[in-house]
Design a protein with these regions (language model features):
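Active-site beta->alpha loop and helix N-cap motifs at the rims of alpha/beta catalytic domains
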Residues: 2-161, 178
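Beta/alpha (TIM)-barrel catalytic core signal, keyed to glycine-rich beta->alpha loops juxtaposed to Asp/Glu
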Residues: 159-187
């Protein structure tokens, strides 16, 4: 995974943003479909030892196969096991804004500042105005200037993308809180 770091209002967001290579972290499941926490922790530690950051609960991690509560608990668990919260970028996206807000706040409480956020993907044809309202509401409700949002642009899966106009509008309003984008547009 690579991210594009944004620059807003003359402030280099890159000095605040996640740096280096991040790898999707596969989520190991037990036969009963619970997450195998020990294997997840070992995989994360191995990646960190290889100087690779952690993209947990994205597409390859089956993040949307986990409940928001499971993801919040796993972030807290990983940090408690010694996984560096500054090298982790969990996917907090979803369709229900209150869930996205709650999970993002849980990440911040665990010390994780960088989050990867999908657009709300169930309803198709969402306008830039609708996406702007969603992300504005997310940022305002979270209410923490240390938050770093990476916009997850993956239209082959979500069927919704981020236009440059939308990104510019978000940057103009929220500056370094909009830290970058993960472009999985496939073009």
């Amino acid at each position: 995974m690579t991210t594009t770091t944004t620059q807003a209002s003359g402030t280099a967001a890159s000095s605040l943003a996640m740096k280096g290579v991040l790898s999707p972290v596969l989520t190991p499941f037990r036969p009963d479909l619970s997450v195998h926490k020990e294997l997840l922790t070992a995989q994360c530690q191995w990646l960190l030892n290889c100087n690779v950051g952690l993209a947990v609960f994205g597409t390859n991690s089956e993040g949307n196969s986990l409940s928001f509560g499971e993801r919040a608990d796993l972030v807290q668990y990983l940090v408690a096991q010694g996984i560096d919260p500054h090298r982790m970028m969990p996917g907090t996206g979803g369709c229900a804004l209150p869930d996205v807000v709650s999970l993002t706040q849980a990440c911040l409480r665990a010390g994780v500042k960088d989050v990867l956020v999908l657009p709300p993907f169930y309803y198709k044809g969402v306008s830039d105005d609708g996406l702007y309202a969603f992300f504005s509401e997310l940022i305002e409700r979270v209410g923490d200037s240390s938050l770093r949002v990476y916009l997850y642009h993956i239209p082959p899966v979500s069927q919704i993308g981020f236009s440059m106009d939308l990104i510019e509008k978000l940057l103009n309003k929220y500056g370094p809180v909009i830290a970058g984008a993960k472009d999985s547009g496939g073009q």
